[in-house]
């Protein structure tokens, strides 16, 4: 998250391509967490932990190597594939830790899942402070050193957990069969996963280019086969409530993970003008999350999980809207609103799923995380990148001084030197073509070209902030959905967790 702009410069990426690199570090998480959730009760939590450790160490080696290879293309491939391996490891971590906590604290799931997920912002705070410190006091430190730091926590958690005995899951204890677990997710859940997975596979094997129709149809057939197979086995569409929560999770993940992944890069131009490190915004909002998640218990008791989520969505809307134009100290006031807004999203949603769909065991609890990460990696990160390019072009159209400096830059209310691209073969976008801009400025005197280029760069940097207003549409959709759920549960007598009725034996849990 803190190195996106560094990698853009090193490997010559545009915003959407940088989003694609961020995405490969996200979406495999979904594949890993869902796959492990299907079999984790059989292979054991410790196996997932060992897999995660291996993934984090391999990523560290590949990423550090990417810095030292002389060929940029090879370095980029090491970074790209290493990010994929790291994401698989991240998914394995959450595949075992979520059900472990839900089992250990079955009467206070939302509270303890919030405390568990304080580790996410905690990691961002520690990493952010380390990297800002390095940038401040040892500016020439290679980014390979920064990436290498990931090996430290990986070794620590491996040594902490390798000798421990993990508990039996809540589902298995209750005697809920494997088929019943899958039935909670159903064909509906499988279809959502299949759509996102097919889009991602098409992009992954296209390498950012295009694939032939037969190959695309092959991936579509794979997705259809997955859904049909799931349906034949479970003979269930899935719980409607769970499917509704899954739909909410897609914009939720984009609001939290997508914005976190881009906010340092988006605010970099403004931060330079205000003379502070852009990383401070992410560190600050993450610090708010870290502290507040430890107090989720009494807040949930006061508001209910859905009330907390609705208020959080409202704060996120206000925070992102304010961040889109805030200047100076007001940036941190806006960031405070956004930080409080995003604090409880992810773990409280997991708590709601675990409390309302406990028969789904590790699958429903982890699959909703997986779908969120798959959505933000497949669509969220690149889409935010396209919002930036759109904001840049709008700012150029509004800058009449810049247009007078570079004749031919704008015509008919549109930026002329652009290149049309398509990410994931789904999202079309236009990016400002630096080579075409250079052709226009080459016709100017050296002094005029330098002044125009400086104006253009500053205009683009400042405009990125505006993209945050467009991102507010995600929590707006979420707020509407949470209000619908609040009224739904009120019609049922209020929000109450579902308790599993424990069977006298565990035999049913082992049936396929």
Show where each model-derived region lies:
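Glycine-rich segments within core transmembrane alpha-helices of 12-TM secondary carriers
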Residues: 108-131, 135, 365-388
């Amino acid at each position: 998250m803190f190195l996106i702009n560094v990698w853009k410069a090193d490997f010559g990426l545009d915003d959407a391509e940088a989003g694609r690199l961020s995405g490969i570090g996200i979406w495999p998480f979904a594949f890993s967490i869902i796959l492990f959730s299907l079999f984790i009760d059989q292979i054991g939590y410790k196996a997932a932990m060992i897999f995660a450790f291996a993934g984090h160490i391999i990523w560290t080696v590949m990423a550090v190597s990417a810095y030292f290879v002389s060929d940029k293309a090879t370095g980029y491939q090491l970074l790209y594939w290493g990010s994929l391996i790291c994401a698989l490891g991240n998914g394995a971590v959450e595949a075992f830790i979520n059900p472990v906590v839900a089992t250990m604290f079955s009467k206070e799931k939302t509270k303890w899942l919030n405390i568990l997920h304080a580790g996410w912002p905690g990691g961002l705070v520690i990493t952010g402070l380390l990297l800002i410190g390095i940038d401040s006091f040892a500016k020439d430190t290679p980014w390979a050193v920064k990436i290498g730091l990931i090996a430290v926590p990986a070794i620590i958690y491996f040594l902490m957990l390798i000798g421990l005995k993990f508990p039996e899951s809540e589902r298995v204890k209750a005697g809920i069969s494997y088929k019943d677990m899958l039935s909670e997710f159903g064909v509906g859940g499988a279809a959502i996963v299949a759509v996102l997975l097919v889009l991602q596979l098409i992009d992954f094997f296209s390498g950012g280019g295009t694939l032939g129709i037969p190959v695309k149809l092959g991936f579509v057939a794979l997705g259809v086969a997955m859904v049909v197979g799931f349906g034949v086995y479970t003979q269930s569409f899935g719980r409607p409530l769970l499917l509704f929560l899954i739909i909410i999770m897609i914009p939720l993940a984009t609001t939290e993970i997508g914005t976190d992944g881009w906010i340092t890069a988006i605010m970099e131009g403004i931060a330079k003008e205000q003379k502070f490190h852009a990383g401070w915004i992410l560190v600050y909002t993450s610090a708010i999350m870290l502290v507040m998640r430890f107090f989720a218990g009494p807040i949930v008791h006061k508001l209910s999980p859905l009330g907390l989520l609705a208020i959080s969505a409202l704060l996120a809307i206000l925070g992102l809207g304010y961040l889109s134009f805030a200047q100076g100290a007001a940036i941190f006031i806006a960031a405070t609103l956004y930080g409080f807004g995003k604090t409880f999203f992810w773990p409280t949603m997991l708590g709601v799923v675990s409390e309302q769909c406990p028969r789904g065991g590790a699958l429903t609890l982890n699959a909703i995380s997986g779908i969120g990460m798959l959505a933000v990696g497949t669509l969220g990160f690149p889409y935010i990148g396209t919002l930036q390019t759109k904001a840049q072009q709008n700012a150029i159209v509004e800058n009449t001084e810049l247009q007078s400096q570079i004749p031919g830059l704008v015509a008919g209310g549109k930026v002329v030197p652009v290149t049309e691209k398509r990410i994931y073969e789904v999202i079309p976008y236009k990016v400002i073509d630096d080579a075409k801009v250079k052709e226009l400025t080459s016709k100017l005197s050296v002094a005029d070209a330098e002044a125009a280029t400086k104006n253009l760069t500053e205009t683009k940097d400042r405009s990125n902030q505006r993209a945050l207003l467009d991102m507010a549409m995600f929590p707006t959709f979420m707020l509407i959905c949470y209000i619908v759920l609040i009224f739904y549960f009120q019609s049922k007598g209020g929000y109450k967790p579902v308790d599993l009725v424990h069977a006298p034996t565990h035999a049913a849990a082992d049936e396929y």
